[in-house]
């Protein structure tokens, strides 16, 4: 008991501030989420593509980019010319013009300034080149680094972030978002830039802090119950053997301790990242199986010869599914053309990719689905869920717009 009391007391002294921060910052996050660029805003910031000027075939570009290394391919307009954007496993990005195959030069301040002036009607206050800052520290931005941060002289004090590789808008924040997120997500996730830019270190720090928090709370609940039983045995009707603040700490701990433990455990599990449980992220082998081969091999079959003309076409994305390239067209505000994903086609591709498992169920993920909301965030509307009969009771989630293999969770833990 003395050892447990010592641990609870001093872990509480060290972690008490973190508990308070996690709770209060979590309340802020309920109302102000971390800044994220909306898809329609991203598309609006792009320029129209001159599809007639696309003269370099995709197989030529893919060969030049590296057929075995490329993981994604799309077309946008850069400098009023169509350009291929190649993504790699290493999170690198390469841009080449689609009219002659030459590399797109890195963007400079002048080109970014001209683009902002053309796409916004707001005056510019400042432009600077940044490698990392608080709102672009996530690893999903690595391919676009360094970025140009453009500060607008508007009432919202808007900051725009543009890739130095492609010139695309990749992030947008306002003064209100930044203020509340310093009190919310930055505190809640222990997200200072100097720590978060080292993902593995940040992940380890948060995981162990949460584990020690669980230990502190569990010991506290146990000690609280033990003291409660002792005093009830000695004095009928008494709730606590302590006085003053210790008494209130004991009584409140008895009622709220289990809630605190479940709260800390749930946060700790969200940071597991494969330590104790499987992750829902598909492996490269699983992605390749759904694609019907490597992305480079499948997408090299793409042809733009019959590509319809759209006056406001902003982006062409190429995906791979079941050995066939899939072309998805997006306009200024929305996806305007995508092939229809037939149930029989899904079943055939999944059966081929997972020959040792049978398909038990095929369904459309409903809005507000429990496991989707807790484990994977929000999936696109109309996402298909395929349930397999393997030992892990695997589910596959496939986006019906892009045919992208989104997640692959096994037995659910909520």
What are these model-derived regions, one by one?
Residues 1-42, 195, 199-283:
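Internal alpha-helical transmembrane segments
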Residues 404-413:
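Conserved small/polar residues in nucleotide/adenosyl-binding loops
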